């Protein structure tokens, strides 16, 4: 896992339970797919994902301490170093430990990139057999509450509740 500028073993990629993001949901992320192709492993729309990560971070007042080139290379290297040809990649920008409260002025910003093998999102049989769907009792969060184009950690609680509701 790439963590704050260097690669570390998965077991060593730890953060404090006092991370501001853990308490307040103040982080942003991307979900990126890499696929095996005729020309080797390709990462789907990588520049677009990196741009959105930076836009999301700006919307949440997270100052990423690296430029887009560094993050792009960390994403590519995460796939390569983990020997993955088809993968899910999760860059995450989050506040570390420090002062608590709703204004994390002096809290450090951390960045991680993890990549792992992940097959078909809805299962291997979904393409042939289809999937069951439902309408959740949970409503989408209003765009006046969260920036809808930003992938904010806290904003995904709504999606988690809807998924749990659908599965149950």
Which residues fall in each region the model found?
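Short, internal active-site loops enriched in acidic
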Residues: 94-99
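Helix-start/capping segments and mature chain N-termini
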Residues: 1-66, 73-77, 100-168
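Short secondary-structure capping/junction motifs at helix and strand boundaries
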Residues: 63-68, 80-92, 122-123
């Amino acid at each position: 896992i790439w963590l704050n500028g260097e690669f570390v073993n998965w077991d060593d990629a730890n953060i404090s339970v006092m991370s501001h993001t853990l308490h307040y949901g103040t982080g942003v992320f991307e979900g990126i797919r890499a696929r095996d192709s005729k020309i080797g492993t390709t990462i789907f729309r990588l520049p677009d994902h990196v741009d959105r990560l930076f836009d999301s971070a700006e919307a949440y007042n997270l100052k990423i301490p690296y430029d887009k080139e560094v993050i792009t290379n960390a994403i590519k290297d995460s796939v390569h170093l983990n020997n993955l040809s088809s993968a899910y990649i999760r860059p995450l920008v989050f506040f570390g430990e420090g002062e608590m409260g709703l204004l994390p002025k002096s809290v450090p910003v951390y960045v991680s990139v993890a990549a792992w093998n992940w097959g078909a999102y809805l299962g291997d049989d979904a393409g042939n057999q289809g999937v069951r769907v439902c309408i959740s009792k949970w409503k989408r969060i209003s765009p006046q509450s969260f920036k809808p184009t930003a992938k904010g950690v806290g904003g995904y609680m709504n999606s988690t509740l809807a998924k749990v509701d659908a599965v149950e």
